[in-house]
Design a protein with these regions (language model features):
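A short alpha/beta connector and helix-capping loop motif
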Residues: 57-59, 75-101, 106-107, 112
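Bacterial N-terminal signal peptides
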Residues: 17-29
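Short hydrophobic beta-strand that contains or immediately precedes a catalytic carboxylate
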Residues: 62-64
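Short, well-ordered beta-to-alpha junction loops that form the rim of enzyme active sites
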Residues: 111-114, 202
Length: 274
């Protein structure tokens, strides 16, 4: 009887041991996973590297919305994008990209965001459109006047002006929502025989990702500079993380600023030797 009664007890003890072990492993594993930086690349990626290689004669740096309202503490959206802009060291990284692109002699293009009074009379809008209009982001007094533009949130960041206002940078007509379907970015790129794009700017999960998707569908080869983009952080989600996942899935390259500058510099040297 003693032997029989000990069997359930042994089984019960073993079951408790297994349960505690599994729970402990799960908790520890979960803690370890949670401790990993949210934006860190996987240690063993399952997706192949597309192997994008720059040809400077066919390359352009396209920067989206490099404007005060998106990138400056003085901007109207700073309360929702400021944390991400700061985390990514966005403005210094973009400055480095501008400088490297100019030194390498590649085309530089700006796809800006402007809203005019008639844009505030739209009959229907999405959530982010409403938010932008409520904040009066990128507002200008009209398409044919620069009155009130200087120093406004629609103006380019002061750090970038030496590169943008050098007489060689192409400033496209404005996009209105997220993608470049309604401005002349693609036309300008095609007219310069550009088919490789280095993409940066704001906001990562909105305008940057929309430009990326449209460029890819039109046959461009596109690398996104992962620390030269940023996005809003809201209760609905982290826009940067959402974008980063999709960049990994669809872009021809997801590079850091360091990697991009190194690629531009290396190709510049190789071009100079030929």
């Amino acid at each position: 009887m003693c032997i029989r009664s000990s069997v359930p007890m042994l089984f019960s003890s073993f079951a408790r041991f297994v349960f505690v072990t599994v729970v402990t492993m799960t908790v520890v594993g979960g803690t370890a996973s949670a401790a990993q930086p949210a934006y860190q690349d996987p240690k063993t990626p399952s997706l192949p590297d597309p192997g994008m290689r720059l040809d400077l004669k066919r390359t352009a740096l396209v920067v989206i919305d490099p404007q005060i309202d998106f990138m400056s503490p003085k901007g109207k959206s700073w309360s929702i994008v400021g944390e991400s802009v700061t985390e990514q060291n966005l403005v210094p990284n973009l400055t480095r990209l501008f400088r490297a692109a100019k030194q390498a002699g590649v085309m530089v293009m700006i796809s800006p965001h402007y809203y005019y009074p008639h844009d505030h009379a739209w009959k229907f809008q999405g959530p982010l459109e409403i938010l932008q209009h409520n904040l009066k982001m990128f507002d200008r007094q009209g398409p044919l006047t620069l009155e009130g533009f200087k120093g406004s949130g629609a103006e380019f960041m002061p750090e970038f002006k030496p590169f943008i206002e050098d007489g060689r940078t192409i400033v496209a007509s404005p996009h209105k929502l997220y993608g470049p379907q309604v401005n002349d970015v693609v036309l300008q790129l095609r007219k310069q025989r550009v088919d490789q794009i280095i993409l940066a700017g704001m906001a990562a999960n909105l305008c940057v990702e929309s430009h990326l998707r449209h460029f890819l569908e039109l046959g461009f080869e596109v690398a996104v500079v992962r620390d030269a983009v940023a996005a809003a952080k809201l209760p609905e989600g982290d826009g940067y993380l959402a974008a980063l996942i999709n960049f990994r899935f669809i872009a021809n390259g997801v590079w850091s600023t360091d990697q991009t500058v190194e690629r531009l510099t290396r190709q510049e040297r190789l071009t100079g030797q030929n």
